């Protein structure tokens, strides 16, 4: 995978044409997934378990790639006169009638190219014309050429795919839950619910679970030293429990492990956890009961404990919670092209909190920029901080990365286990971008284009 767009470089992308994926794939049940994973693990025992964990999605996975042993057939060639103008420097007039997504098929392209370009068209949506005033005519001409803007495809006037699904926010992708105060204690009230989750607006919803009616659950954010009371009402038809992952408890009965530190929370029951947030850092909360199913279906969320004085300085913040069970490979409960891009202006520093709530390791690779890793599992690394462009995050781990944007462009940002990000229909799943613009005002322009 290469940079999707770098205004300083004329290189083409890997995929240059698009058509949406079929929505007729059946849903995958967690028991089915668990059986496959168990059998696969047994078959590969003795050194192959890692390979099993990193295997591609099953053929009938709702949002995974569709396996095919047959080669991709080339589409019929078309005459040069029927091809769109590759030198377009502006989007076609709004009065022009949009043609079907994908447009005329250039010679030599396959259905893979068609689908792949459509995914990127959906990801950028009406950001594409907005980028003209940000990157300038020359860079925009290259982007228009890559995406075939002369086709006047429908996505040019539609919001990006991530703005069409619920529970996504441009600030940090996960809105914090506002507490109430009770004698100095910060009280957070949440429900544990059965929900329908939209991984992508063009896909059917999946039957999932969520805290506060959403997956991931609302971010619980406090300051080091705060007394925290988390009250959960179980609206499920089954028992559950809630574990605050990474918290150092004075009272181990607050640890949230049914039949170890508590009885399970029964349907209709309200259960309270109370503790002092003694250590700052990027933490998580999730089910710790029937967890393969419940966490895999969405019972997870971020728990951030801010230090009283934060030595880490940054301009913007994002939280990425990865999961790889229900719905395939997701970032914050959504898969590409419905993932929220990281936005930054040249010179700004972005903090990204990686949290792996899945069952597989995911190595996050950022194109064109460097990540400085300043914390692991909530613990500051101090002088042991290191730089990298690929960061492996194991299940249960959290890393805090700083990215100082130095190069304008649309930079790919993805898991580097390739079957988690690309299939026969192009990019999907754990793919995102870092969109770096020349000035801070341009970030505001992008946001305005999305929410207008």
What annotation goes with each model-predicted range?
Residues 177, 217-221, 338-343:
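Short beta-strand segments of immunoglobulin-like
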Residues 281-283, 350, 409-411:
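Exposed beta-strand face motif in extracellular beta-rich ectodomains
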Residues 1-37, 44-53, 59-66, 72:
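N-terminal secretory signal peptides
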Residues 187-304, 360-392, 414-432:
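Histidine- and aromatic-enriched segments that form or immediately flank copper-ligand environments
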Residues 306-321, 436-451:
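Low-complexity, Pro/Ser/Thr- and charge-rich linker/hinge segments at domain boundaries
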């Amino acid at each position: 995978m290469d940079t999707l767009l770098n205004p300083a470089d004329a290189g083409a992308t890997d995929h240059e044409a698009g058509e949406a994926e079929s929505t007729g794939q059946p849903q995958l049940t967690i028991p089915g997934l668990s059986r496959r994973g168990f059998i696969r693990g047994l078959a590969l025992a003795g050194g192959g378990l890692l390979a099993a964990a990193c295997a591609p999605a099953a053929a009938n996975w709702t949002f995974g790639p569709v396996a095919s042993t047959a080669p991709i057939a080339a589409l019929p060639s078309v005459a040069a006169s029927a091809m769109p103008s590759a030198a377009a420097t502006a989007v076609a007039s709004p009065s022009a009638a949009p043609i079907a997504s994908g447009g005329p098929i250039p010679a030599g392209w396959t259905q893979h190219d068609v689908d792949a370009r459509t995914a990127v068209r959906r990801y950028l949506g009406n950001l594409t014309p907005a980028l003209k005033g940000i990157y300038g005519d020359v860079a925009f001409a290259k982007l228009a050429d890559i995406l075939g803007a002369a086709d006047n495809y429908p996505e040019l006037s539609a919001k990006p795919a991530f703005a069409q699904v619920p529970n996504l926010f441009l600030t940090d992708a996960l809105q914090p839950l506002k507490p109430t105060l009770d004698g100095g204690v910060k009280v957070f009230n949440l429900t544990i619910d059965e929900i329908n989750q939209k991984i992508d607006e063009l896909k059917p919803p999946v039957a999932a679970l969520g805290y506060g009616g959403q997956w991931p659950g609302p971010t619980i954010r406090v300051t080091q030293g705060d007394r925290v009371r988390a009250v959960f009402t179980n609206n499920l038809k089954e028992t559950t429990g809630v574990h605050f992952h990474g918290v150092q408890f004075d009272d181990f009965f607050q640890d949230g492990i049914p039949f170890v530190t508590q009885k399970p929370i029964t349907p209709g029951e309200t259960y309270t956890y109370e503790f002092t947030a003694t250590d700052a850092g990027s933490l998580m909360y999730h089910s710790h009961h029937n967890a393969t199913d419940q966490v895999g279906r969405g019972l997870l969320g971020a728990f951030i404990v801010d230090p009283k004085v934060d030595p880490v300085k940054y301009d913007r913040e994002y939280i990425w919670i990865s999961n790889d069970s229900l719905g395939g490979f997701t970032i914050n409960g959504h898969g590409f092209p419905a993932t929220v891009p990281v936005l930054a202006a040249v010179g700004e520093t972005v903090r990204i909190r990686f949290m792996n709530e899945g069952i597989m390791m995911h190595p996050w690779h950022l194109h064109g920029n460097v990540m400085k890793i300043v914390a692991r599992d909530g613990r500051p690394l101090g002088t042991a901080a290191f730089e990298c462009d690929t960061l492996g995050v194991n299940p249960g781990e959290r890393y805090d990365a700083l990215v100082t944007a130095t190069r304008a462009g649309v930079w790919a940002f993805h898991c580097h286990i390739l079957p988690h990000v690309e299939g026969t229909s192009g990019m999907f799943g754990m793919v995102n971008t870092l969109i770096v613009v020349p000035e801070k005002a341009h970030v505001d322009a992008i946001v305005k284009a999305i929410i207008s």
